[in-house]
Amino acid sequence: MTLVIDRGEDETAVAPISQEEIQSILEAVLADEGVERTCYVSVTIATDDEIRAQNLEWRGINAPTDVISLECEYPDDPDLGDDEPCELGDIILAPAFIERQAADFSTTAADEFRIMLVHGMLHLLGYDHLDDEEAQVMEEVENGILAAIATDAPSLTVEFTRHDEDGDAV
C-alpha cells in the first residue's frame, strides 16, 4: 500500500499516532478485507476549520466533523487491470475534533483517532451506515479490526455509527 499523509494547509493539526502506526492500521484494514491489490490512500490531518470547509463542500454540512472519506476506486473494480494499483481515495481526519469527541466516548484521543481511521478506511472500501443494518455490519467489521490492533484500552469497541441525513449521530 502506498500512503500519502498531508497536514493540510494549516500545519498546526497533528495526529496523535505516528505515520508508521497510521500505515499499519490501514494495512490491517486491507488485510482484514482480503485486499491484495496495491492501493493508494491519501490521509489529510486537518484543523476543525479545514474539515468544516470539506464537510460543507462534499456533504453540504457547515460544521466540523471527525472524519470524511472521499472514495475514488474500489479494489475489485473490473475496469482496473490485474496489476494496476487502486486509487482508494482520501481520508480527512480532524484530531482536535476527535480529541473532544474522545471524552464523550471515554476513550483516549489516540484510540478515538484509531477508530476514526479504521472507520474512514472502511468507507473507502464501500461500507456505510445509512441504516441500522448497514451500521451493524460496519460496526462488527470495525470491532474485529480494532481487536487486532494495539490500542490504549484493553478492549475497544465501536457503537453509534448511525447518522441522520444531517450527519448527526443518532
Residue map of PLM features:
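An acidic/histidine-cluster motif and surrounding catalytic segment
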Residues: 1-113, 125-170
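Short active-site segment of divalent metal-dependent hydrolases/proteases
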Residues: 118, 122-126
